[in-house]
A protein has these predicted regions:
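Single conserved hydrophobic/aromatic residue that forms the stacking wall/gate
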Residues: 203-214
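Short, charged low-complexity intrinsically disordered segments located at boundaries
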Residues: 3-8, 68-70, 133-144, 175-181, ...
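Long, amphipathic alpha-helical stalk/connector segments used for oligomerization, subunit docking
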Residues: 124-169, 173
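An amphipathic alpha-helical core segment
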Residues: 166-205
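Alpha-helix capping/termination and helix-coil
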Residues: 85, 110, 114, 118, ...
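Acidic/His-rich structured neighborhood in mature extracellular/periplasmic domains
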Residues: 1-134
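Generic structural signal of hydrophobic/aromatic residues within well-ordered alpha-helices
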Residues: 36, 111-115, 148, 172, ...
Length: 214
């Protein structure tokens, strides 16, 4: 569960042992997550509930094999494994953006070298194409978060911010739909355009790519 003030792109964080402050609250049960999200909404926060296919205990425990990723393509499964292993090797307390960006870059390098060793150039090409498309989308969210932050900072009253936010979301929705029609690789953006868009979603969509170059 992610939460942010109505007129801020900075996420609320929670402190955990070992890992420090994290910009999300984790749950193993969806009902509990939705209950907590409702509580945050009651405090006038934007909220976003997102799932994750895997998680890392940073080497403290044996990490489980879950049914959320066993049917992944081979290269995407390798990407996930490299990503989670990266957290074992380097994890900066309280810096979600750095940790996720580092793990993303580490995974891409790992999969590239692994696929080369398997001598499967087509699989590598397909993987890198999927990765590049995902990076393009995430960088779009990075830019939109910057734009929305500037809007909030340029206005003084809540009424002005509320109206500007509403217009920003409507225009962003249209942009997602337009992009989905203009590029076959981005067809799934039409699905994103139908989902709730708020301060939290802009952050959660870009955190793993904000410091990477693609």
């Amino acid at each position: 569960v992610y939460a942010a003030p109505k007129f801020s792109t900075e996420l609320k964080s929670w402190w955990y042992p070992i890992v420090g402050n994290m910009a999300y609250r984790g749950f193993f049960n969806e009902t509990d997550a939705r209950s907590f999200a409702s509580k945050m909404q009651g405090e006038d926060m934007d909220v976003h509930i997102g799932g994750t296919p895997a998680y890392s205990t940073l080497g403290w425990f044996d990490d489980p094999v879950l049914n959320t990723f066993i049917n992944y393509r081979e290269e995407d499964l390798a990407d996930l494994i490299f990503h989670e292993l990266a957290h074992h090797h380097l994890f900066v307390k309280g810096d979600t953006t750095f940790n996720e960006s580092f793990a993303t870059a580490f995974a891409q390098i790992g999969v590239t070298e692994w696929a080369k060793a398997k001598e499967n150039p087509q699989a590598l090409e397909d993987y890198l194409a999927r990765r590049q498309t995902k990076h393009m989308v995430n960088q779009l969210y990075v830019q939109k978060k910057i734009e929305l932050k500037a809007i909030y900072e340029s206005l003084e009253t809540e009424k002005e911010k509320r109206e500007a936010k509403k217009q920003f979301i409507a225009e962003f929705r249209q942009q997602l739909n337009d992009m989905s029609l203009s590029d076959p690789r981005l067809s799934k953006l039409a699905i994103l355009a139908e989902r709730p868009i708020n301060n939290c979603l802009l952050y959660t969509s870009d955190a793993a790519d904000e410091l990477t170059s693609g």
